[in-house]
Amino acid sequence: MDLTNSKLSSFNFKEKRVLLRVDFNIPIRDEEVLNDERMIRALPTIKYLLEKAKSLRIITHRGRPLESGEVQPEFSVKPIAKRLSQLLDIPVPIADSLDGLEQDKKIIMLENIRFFQGEKEKVKYKATQFNTLCVV
């Protein structure tokens, strides 16, 4: 898919850190992705942003973990990051905290956004936190 004529191409991503929220809530069994169709459909956008932006931060959720604010391994996005690494042929590290998104890496995936308190409460709350981390 060529994104040259898409709305994305109207933005100047050069030297900008971009935050991309994707729906990678996909079936996983025994730490293996069973269906990567959603990931494959997102690849053109991800590749475009990797090419144009300074860096890319990806957030997604997986399942409905308890609202304890604690990591629950059965809802981790690590298998998703592993599969995305294979699809992109580059490492996709996981950030276990918002501070981890500030690492100097081309691409980082945040651990399951639903592990973070406030995720379900108000979009504005999270948007404010991410505003300081990413420009777009």
Predicted region positions:
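Active-site loop-to-helix "anion-binding N-cap" substructures in soluble metabolic enzymes
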Residues: 1-136
